[in-house]
């Protein structure tokens, strides 16, 4: 999730 990835310090890119 790109939006969530932009707002989290963790490397989540789904």
Curated annotation (Swiss-Prot):
Entry superkingdom: Eukaryota
Q: What does this protein do?
A: Stimulates synthesis of ecdysteroid in the testes of larvae and pupae.
User: This protein is called what?
Assistant: Testis ecdysiotropin peptide C
Recorded source organism is Lymantria dispar (Gypsy moth)
Q: What is the lineage of its organism?
A: Eukaryota, Metazoa, Ecdysozoa, Arthropoda, Hexapoda
């Amino acid at each position: 999730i790109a939006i969530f990835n932009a707002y989290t310090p963790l490397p989540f890119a789904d």
